[in-house]
């Protein structure tokens, strides 16, 4: 992901990197290319406009450090704004004591939610936390069976010694759709079993749909009220792009999602969802799925992602070092003024 966007941004910013002096016109010309690159990457249009306006304003008003070329300063501005766009993020799963900590996963059908449940269980198991995974997606009996297979594989093959349990009521699949509250009842009983077993974390795999509809949202809202999860995570397919952001916004409006997990992040998708979802929904990206193995779930770090997008980690480090040196120099000058009584 981001290979195409990284190349286009590199081309746009390279027009500035060799210049000894940069005018406002130079900056605006470069940002037009940046804007085109972001739109082509399927970043939300409103996000792109705000981002480019902020970079231009920052770049024009920024004091250039003596040890940097102006073009390097602009790269630093773009990097900082990318970090702000995707962050701040705290990827740690905040556990409650006494447990269990309840994590509710939701998402559209095909988003990779069931696999992500397994990856999240493996992530927690590897950190010494016992987990129970509960199957509350009852509209498809195969979904319950698949989650059971995934959970047992994590229990047998996952790193760490902590236990991973599976809770399911497969007979309830036949009742699902004929009466309301079936999935809610399963979640309540799963929580009761999790408390009885003494696990640290309960993960609820809820029902998905091919598209967002009111019955789905009402069911999720009912589960939310019934078990009061500590965190609600929305699983979003990174390959879907702009549609993923729109669905994330719809989920967040009804459920107040605490974080987003981007699945299929290792795909050749254009990356627009990663750059848009935080600004559009207010919910930060917590994790990204980077492969098919259970351990392929990574904490999301905006700083690292911004450096990866720009493909200019050395330049960004140079900017940060130069800014630190300027801050130290200013501090020394201030101390000198205070010592000589010249502070005004």
Please tell me what each predicted stretch does.
Residues 1-2, 341:
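Compositionally biased, charge-rich terminal segments
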Residues 3-179, 186-200, 204-206:
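Primarily NTPase-proximal linker/entry elements flanking Walker-type ATP/GTP-binding cores
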Residues 155, 171, 187-190, 195, ...:
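Conserved phosphate-handling catalytic cores of large alpha/beta enzymes
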Residues 1, 26, 66, 70, ...:
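Catalytic cores of large soluble enzymes that bind and process phosphate-bearing ligands
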């Amino acid at each position: 992901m981001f290979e195409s966007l990284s190349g286009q941004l590199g081309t746009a910013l390279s027009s500035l990197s060799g210049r000894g002096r940069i005018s406002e016109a130079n900056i605006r010309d470069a940002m037009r290319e940046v804007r085109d690159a972001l739109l082509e990457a399927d970043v939300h249009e409103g996000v792109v406009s705000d981002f480019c306006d902020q970079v231009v304003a920052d770049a024009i008003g920024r004091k250039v450090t003596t040890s940097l070329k102006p073009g390097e300063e602009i790269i630093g501005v773009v990097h900082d704004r990318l970090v702000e766009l995707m962050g701040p993020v705290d990827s740690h799963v905040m556990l409650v004591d006494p447990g269990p900590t309840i994590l509710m996963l939701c998402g559209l059908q095909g988003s990779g939610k069931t696999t992500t449940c397994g990856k999240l269980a493996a992530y927690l198991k590897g950190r010494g936390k016992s987990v129970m995974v509960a199957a509350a997606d009852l509209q498809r009996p195969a979904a319950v069976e698949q989650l059971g297979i995934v959970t047992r594989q994590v229990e047998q093959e996952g790193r760490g010694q902590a236990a991973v349990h599976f809770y399911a009521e497969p007979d309830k699949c036949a009742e699902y759709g004929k009466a309301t509250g079936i999935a809610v009842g399963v979640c309540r009983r799963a929580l009761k079993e999790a408390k009885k077993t003494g696990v640290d974390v309960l993960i609820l795999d809820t029902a998905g749909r091919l598209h967002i509809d009111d019955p789905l949202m009402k069911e999720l809202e009912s589960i939310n009220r019934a078990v009061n999860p500590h965190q609600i995570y929305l699983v979003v397919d990174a390959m879907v792009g702009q549609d993923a952001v729109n669905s994330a916004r719809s989920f967040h409006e009804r459920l107040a999602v605490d974080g987003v997990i981007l699945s299929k992040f290792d795909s050749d998708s254009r990356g627009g969802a990663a750059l848009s979802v935080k600004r559009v929904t207010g919910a930060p990206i917590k994790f990204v799925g980077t492969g098919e193995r259970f351990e392929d779930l990574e904490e999301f770090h905006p700083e690292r992602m911004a450096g990866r997008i720009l493909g200019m980690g050395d330049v960004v480090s140079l900017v940060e070092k130069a800014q630190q040196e300027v801050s130290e120099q200013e501090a020394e000058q201030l101390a000198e003024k205070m010592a000589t009584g010249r502070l005004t």
